[in-house]
Amino acid sequence: MKIALTEFVTLDGVSQGPGSPTEDTSDDFTRGGWLVPYLDKLFVRRTSDWLGLADGLLLGRRTYEAFARDWPQITDPNDPFTERMNSLPKYVVTNTLTEGSWHPTTVLRGDPIQTVGKLKAQPGRELQIHGSARLGKALLSAGLVDTLRLVIAPTVAGSGRRLLDHPSAPVGLRLVRHEVTANGLLLLEYERVNAAPVGEYEGVTAFV
């Protein structure tokens, strides 16, 4: 399977608490809900399309527990995400949980790079990481993430956990798709390349 990382971030890279002020208040974060004012039809359609590519969800413990609390409570039959989120196989990377309450769930214990690497080797389409910024950053630095999808909100949070705060290795990415919604969200899709390219600036004449 390919591993796809989907994250909602602000212009200053904050990924904490996009959905509401109370979604994630850890570390005294009080600025949640920053994504909601910009939601629109294109955002819903595109993120629903992305979720339709998943054969499983790969989550860190904190995100898993939040999703397990919230998603089973959504009963709106017109919600385009609920059925998929609740029915997909979930894999939670944790050394503290022994079982999961949000079925079907498999607990992945031990070294996350090794356990996820074994899971990635199985046949299938996409194993998708949603939220779980720490897990996503670790797997991205380890070269296990194939696709990175970002929804960037036109706002600056000023504080909160950042998606790519101090990655442990450089990561090369190639932009393969981009859209701008009517409310100003950037929808970006990247593929990982083998190495992060570098160069030396020799003036603008080479590009004129």
Positions of predicted regions on the chain:
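Portal/gating segments that form or line small-molecule/metal binding sites
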Residues: 1-144, 154-208
